[in-house]
Amino acid sequence: MSKANASAERIKDTISSVSNLVKVDSEEDAEIRGKGYVVFDDVSFSYEGTTRAISNISFVLERGKTLGIIGGTGSGKSTIINLMMRFYDTDKGRIYIDGKDIRSYDLPELRKHFGVVFQNDFIFHDTISSNIKIGRDISDEEMKKAAENAMASSFIEKYEDGYQHQAAIH
């Protein structure tokens, strides 16, 4: 129960911190065009009142390429994702998506391009389709495209009832 309380407190803190984010002035809100080009340029970040979570991180991630980020607990892996999704702003350096500073993107526009896979797997006792949609109002076509992008469609379609198959962890 204490883990759940701690997690709830972190979520509350994260949500309330969003209002402190700085938006870069631009002629118009930048729109992500789906090129998928991400650049971390000398990025450093510290959570409030703590030592540096990451220091001077630089990398380029091109569309269709994979970047493996490994490290022990507390090494900054989740921090990199939190910064890309703008739960926080960097202390130093910049993050660019498709050549534009991520601070120029509207938060909902930015975040709709991310999918997060948690370290602990969890499946709702429901259909595969419902687990992919997870409460979002999207079409079956969009849901199937998400499965294709996650390279899951081939095994899902092997089930006789496909996306309507009851999901379960064995």
Predicted regions and their residues:
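A generic local structural motif
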Residues: 8, 24-26, 101-104
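ABC-type nucleotide-binding domain
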Residues: 16, 31-170
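Cytosolic ends of transmembrane helices, especially the final helix of ABC transmembrane type-1 domains
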Residues: 1-14
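Pre-NBD coupling/linker segments of ABC/ABC-like ATPases
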Residues: 20-33
